[in-house]
Amino acid sequence: MGSPHENDSDLPVFLTWRLRDSLPFSRASPRDARHCGSAFVATDRLLDEVSCGPVHLREPAVAEMVVMALQHNANILGHYRLHAFVVMPNHVHLLATPAVELPAMTAAFKEITAERANALLVLPASPFWQEEDYHRTVRYEGEFEEIWNYIEENPVRAGMVKEATEYRWSSASTDAIILQGSQYHVTSIRSSKTGWDNVLTWQDW
C-alpha cells in the first residue's frame, strides 16, 4: 500500500451518481451508510442487477452527452482533473481530483446534464439524478489503481461487454467519442493513469 497524501486538498475522490428512483426505496442504502464501503458495493451490485427504475443513460445520445459534460467540466471549466469514468445505464462512476468544493462540482454537473437529458428524452422538467451520492476520498496509490480498475471493469461485471475497452462510454474505451451532428465533436486520447486528455470542440454548450 502506498503512502497517504499529506494534503487533503489535492486528494482524488471516487464518486457515484445514480438516477432518481433507480433503486426501490426498500433496497436503497440508509443515508448514514451510503459512504460505507460494504454498503456501496452492495448498492452498486443492485444498480447493475435491478430490473425496475429508469435507465435513461442507456440511450446513446444521453450517454454521449454525459461523457461530454464530464470532459467539459474538467477541461474547460476546470472543476476537477478527470482520471477515470464510466457511464452505466442508471449511474455514473468517476475518479477525479476536485479543483472546487465537491458540492459545487456535483451540483454543476447534475444541473446541466439533467436539463440536457430531459430535453433529449422529451421529459418534463423533473429531478433526473438522485439527490444523495456516494463519495470516497482516495488516500493511497494502491487504492487509486484499484478504484480506477473497478470503474472501468463495471460494464464487464454487469455482463454488458467482455472487455472493458469495448464499452464506449468509459475512459477505458479505445474509440474516439464522436457525437452525431455538426454541433459536437470530441477526440479522446487516453494517457497514463494521471488524467484524461482530449482535443475538444464544443459549440453552444
Annotate each PLM feature.
Residues M1-W205:
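Short catalytic/metal-binding and nucleic-acid-binding patches
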